Amino acid sequence: MLLISHRGNVSGSDPSLENNPDHIDRIIVGMEMNVEIDLYVFDQQEMYLGHDQPQYGIDFKWLYTRRNNCPVNDHFNYFWHQIDNFTLTSKGYIWAYPGCEIHLPSRAIAVMPEESKTNLRPFYGICTDYPERYLVNDKASII
């Protein structure tokens, strides 16, 4: 199962650390985990991480080198969504809004499944504020 840390959270939401580049580095390298980040790009050169607003300045080099540390992705995987039930990512994953179910196995990612007790069996992966809950022997697993 693909396990994705939502904004760098590991054991619950922590707004003081969300989208913080140093914290994200610790998650990607230390835990070998993918991280979903909120990226703002202005004039194709200025880049920032942050949820409700641009907060942490980064550059393309930071973004590019981190993708090499992600255990699954070998290129950027990006998407945009608001409250749509499903969004297709650039790498063909189905990004499922919290509470949206799928019934056949697919390349779908359950977002925040803990909010609605989503049945995870048909999903390829999850994006959560609680990735530690899904680790068994340091491997992502459905518990």
List the predicted regions and their residue ranges.
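Phosphate-group recognition and catalysis centered on beta-loop-alpha active-site segments
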Residues: 1-143
